[in-house]
Amino acid sequence: MIQDSMQFAAVESGLRFYQAYDQSLSLWPIESEAFYVSTRFGKTHIIASGPKDAPSLILLHGGLFSSAMWYPNIAAWSSQFRTYAVDIIGDKNKSIPSAAMETRADFAEWMKDVFDSLGLETAHLAGLSLGGSHIVNFLLRAPERVERAVVISPAEAFISFHPDVYKYAAELTGARGAESYIKWITGDSYDLHPLLQRQIVAGVEWQDEQRSLKPTENGFPYVFTDQELKSIQVPVLLMFGEHEAMYHQQMAFERASVLVPGIQAEIVKNAGHLLSLEQPEYVNQRVLSFLCGGIK
């Protein structure tokens, strides 16, 4: 009886999440198509926009935010690229996991599968927070697949989290904890769109062990070593917000600037962790300027 109740709660909370996700996609300002591709870790949900014959840009979202978070950026970027907003498998989104991804090597293999399923030999990459860390990891493990990379507010990667990250993460058990977490990372300078906030709350309340990314020793979050960062050969644009809550952005900026060859790193004023949402106009143009410099 208890098991049946738990399964019912998981299904019910999952349906609420899917409904909230679809509602948040009403913010998507341009035509798109959604589909799944097969990987060794399960079916990965992707939202594609832009001309099919344009260069490819793969987008990786922040944890709990799903691909819906790209709504303020997608029109600008899809004017020059065929964009693929990928739901990171194992997080709260529409991807359907069938096997656990536990290591950084696993995550890189998953991304290779996504490339292969899309028929892409190479692509540009852009990601925020968790998605940004995935990109740094992929640059080390499959640099030949990446043209240029944009890393925004990466989750660790260059410097350890502030202890408050784990305090707020431990409280992510319901609506109140989710709202507290969102308020913490946005501060007083930005209000998340109610539809996106509702989706995040629904994700936190979704009782699904397969969609619950947990820290692991060989997974994420992770601070890359000096040797790893020095070995990056792909052109990288790295962006932080001046009001970053999760770590000391100036220290991360300085470490990246010293270690990563040729990196373009900057700290953007009047923004925090959710840089692409908080300052979309600036981020959109800066990313296009950087990426279009690498179109062959």
Curated annotation (Swiss-Prot):
Q: Which InterPro entries does the record cross-reference, listed alphabetically? A: AB_hydrolase_1 (IPR000073), AB_hydrolase_fold (IPR029058), AB_hydrolase_sf (IPR050266)
Name of protein = Carboxylesterase YbfK
Supply the EC number(s): 3.1.1.1
Q: Which organism is it from?
A: Bacillus subtilis (strain 168)
| Entry keywords, A to Z | Cytoplasm, Hydrolase
- The active site is formed by S129 (charge relay system), E244 (charge relay system), H273 (charge relay system)
Tell me the GO molecular function terms. Answer: carboxylesterase activity
What GO cellular component term, any one, is given? Answer: cytoplasm
